[in-house]
Amino acid sequence: MAPEFDSRTFPIEPILRQAVSLVADRARVAWTLLGTMARNDRPEAGIFLLGLMRVHGGDLTRMATLVRAVSFFPSEAAAEALKAEFYRVPSSPATRTYLNEVLRALIQLPAPLSRKTLTTLAEDKKLSVKWRRRFEESAWRLDG
């Protein structure tokens, strides 16, 4: 029988090396694994993912994968990083898919973090009426 994978004790260094790979598929696998580790009491994995968001900010395809992984890191820092994307990336037909992914990632965070961030975004007049309405509806759905 194969040993069971335990993300709390698995060495992180090889995954970090893979996470900075120039080969997109290799990096994506590592990001997903780092997200799993972050969810399972490995905050250093989540912090590394937040740093990768800074590195890959210009590549929305990679960023879409990264924000999904960050959504597994239940922290105020993750909520703030996801919220910041709505200010950093202008809403347009070309960025809509990415911003929708950011919204999905934000909703995946623990409800109190997600609700607080969505409410803040919904009340911010710097954002479009359409997005503010979506944030408000998403926060309302969290309340069930």
Residue ranges of each PLM-predicted region?
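Structural detector for internal amphipathic alpha-helices that build alpha-solenoid repeat scaffolds
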Residues: 1-8, 20-42, 51-54, 61-76, ...
